[in-house]
Amino acid sequence: MVSLTKRCIAEFIGTFILVFFGAGSAAVTLMIASGGTSPNPFNIGIGLLGGLGDWVAIGLAFGFAIAASIYALGNISGCHINPAVTIGLWSVKKFPGREVVPYIIAQLLGAAFGSFIFLQCAGIGAATVGGLGATAPFPGISYWQAMLAEVVGTFLLMITIMGIAVDERAPKGFAGIIIGLTVAGIITTLGNISGSSLNPARTFGPYLNDMIFAGTNLWNYYPIYVIGPIVGAVLAALTYQYLTSE
């Protein structure tokens, strides 16, 4: 049995990878779109590829980062890299309650450090112009619409995780690519609604570093990306448990 300390380090590394490459790709897209001038900080739907093409690129960046993390770290920690996934697994007794808080702390720290290191690589414009890939409801989308999108998106993510990674009947070796492509598809569809976070840690890292280095306060939106993903993950885990029960 791998020690809790080592598993938490693996969660830190996995969430670092997710935020550095995933959220970083969103920041780069906005920086390209802006031409060096700060536009609406939440509008990252128009960049080099234009509209949907940008979301496909961002989704694939997240998907590849997730797949790589799962294959590299899954045998160590399970590679949750998402507090909503950890809580979802706990809700159906697939993860011990005493380890939930340490996992979530490791995930939040990994996300914050990933966003910070991306800022050091890309420069201050990554925060002042690119927002470090922070998520927020898009113009015309209400608070509750964005939260509903996060519930639905995370429901799909979590039920996929239950089927391909948790269920012992699932074929071995496919979890990384299937989960990664699922996230890519969700981001492509929901990105222009809520930013498609699906993960409280993924949003936490950019929010914290944007506040510190760019003076941008987006925390009023944070409940969307905590409540929505957790509700979606728990509902999906309970649904899968019910559907597969005797």
Curated annotation (Swiss-Prot):
Keyword terms of this UniProt record: Cell membrane, Membrane, Repeat, Transmembrane, Transmembrane helix, Transport
Which sequence ranges are marked TM in the entry?
A: 12-32, 56-76, 104-124, 146-166, 173-193, 218-238
Membrane-side (Cytoplasmic) residue stretches: 1-11, 77-103, 167-172, 239-246
Q: Where is this motif: NPA 1?
A: 82-84
Q: Which PROSITE patterns has this protein been placed in?
A: MIP
Subcellular location(s): the record lists:
Cell membrane
Q: Taxonomically, which superkingdom? A: Archaea
What the entry lists under SUPFAM superfamilies is as follows: Aquaporin-like (SSF81338)
Where, by residue number, is the motif NPA 2?
A: 199-201
Topological domains, Extracellular: 33-55, 125-145, 194-217
The annotated topology with respect to the bilayer is: Multi-pass membrane protein
The molecular function GO annotations come to: water channel activity
Q: Cite a GO CC annotation.
A: plasma membrane
What is the purpose of this protein?
A: Channel that permits osmotically driven movement of water in both directions. It mediates rapid entry or exit of water in response to abrupt changes in osmolarity. Also exhibits a transient but reproducible increase in the initial glycerol flux.
What does the sequence similarity comment in the record state about its family?
A: Belongs to the MIP/aquaporin (TC 1.A.8) family.
Notes concerning its domains: Aquaporins contain two tandem repeats each containing three membrane-spanning domains and a pore-forming loop with the signature motif Asn-Pro-Ala (NPA).
Q: How does it assemble?
A: Homotetramer.
Q: What is the protein name stated in its UniProt record? A: Aquaporin AqpM
**Gene (UniProt):** aqpM
